[in-house]
């Protein structure tokens, strides 16, 4: 099963990767360039990974948003657009953009998310400490789409202990498709991600580099950042409920008890 992809930038296509709900597109725009589209049956989260742009839509307009040079330079800006909404994104500087789509049945209000809205959480402990910036968390008014960004310092683990969300058994776990879209702070850097099911029907380990994407259709999916390189990934999720409930791999759940303190390098951005 192919789970590692390098999305084609500026293709104009929504890549579904075999998912029922999620879709994804990547754009890199020069000043003055633009992207136009219509959300159709999807709700859409436009995340500015870097740069400054304006967003025009049938549901609202947001001029001159963004500003971080790249994901390691500050907190996120994003725009949420509901189903059946025409839009145009115009770059004011060089822009690095991620378009995260999810099939949706209900229509919600379009919204701008600014750095002041980012809900920063320092999760885990010891060398499994990481930073999570909430963009569209479960309490965000949307139908299915969930989006967060995660920073893992050099040598640290994240999505750890390994967890999964492939069974609808609330409140402990819900069934979610997930995408990991990566940025690394230096060109030679990489992360290692493993995706495996309890019965090892899926058991794959990947070396992931800047601009690559991992699909998580099911199973556990831990990540480790190579020593010397800070790792960022954008998570888009959608599924059976507006929740991020997940269950740990019981073989590794004990490590939580060993976490005495947080990694002082975090937060990496603020």
Segments (PLM) and residue ranges:
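A short glycine-rich, His/Asp/Glu-containing loop-to-beta-strand
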Residues: 5-36, 43, 128-179
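Residues that act as N-cap/strand-start positions at coil-to-secondary-structure junctions
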Residues: 11-13, 21-23, 31, 39-40, ...
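Extended, compositionally biased flexible segments
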Residues: 25-26, 31-90
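Double-stranded beta-helix
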Residues: 95-137, 194-196, 234-270
């Amino acid at each position: 099963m192919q789970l590692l992809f390098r999305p084609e930038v500026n293709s104009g296509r929504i890549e579904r990767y075999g998912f029922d709900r999620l879709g994804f597109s990547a754009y890199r725009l020069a000043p003055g360039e633009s992207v136009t589209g219509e959300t159709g049956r999807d709700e859409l989260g436009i995340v500015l990974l870097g740069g400054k742009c304006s967003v025009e839509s049938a549901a609202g307009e947001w001029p001159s948003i963004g500003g971080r040079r790249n994901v390691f330079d500050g907190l996120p800006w994003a725009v949420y657009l509901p189903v059946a909404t025409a839009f145009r994104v115009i770059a004011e500087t060089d822009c690095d953009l991620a378009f995260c789509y999810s099939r949706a049945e209900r229509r919600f209000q379009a919204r701008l998310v600014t750095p002041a809205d980012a809900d920063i959480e320092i999760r885990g402990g010891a060398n499994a400490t990481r930073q999570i910036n909430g963009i569209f968390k479960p309490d965000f008014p949307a139908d299915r789409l969930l989006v967060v960004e995660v920073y893992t310092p050099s040598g640290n683990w994240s999505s750890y202990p390994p967890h999964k969300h492939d069974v609808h058994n609330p409140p402990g776990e819900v069934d979610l498709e997930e995408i990991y879209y990566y940025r690394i702070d230096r060109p030679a850097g990489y992360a290692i991600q493993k995706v495996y099911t309890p019965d090892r029907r899926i058991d794959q380990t990947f070396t992931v580099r800047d601009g690559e994407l991992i699909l998580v259709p099911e199973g556990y999916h831990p990540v480790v950042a190579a020593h010397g390189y800070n790792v960022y990934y954008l998570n888009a999720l959608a599924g059976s409920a507006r929740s991020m409930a997940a269950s740990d791999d019981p073989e590794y759940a004990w490590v939580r008890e060993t976490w005495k303190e947080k990694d002082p390098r975090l937060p990496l951005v603020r």
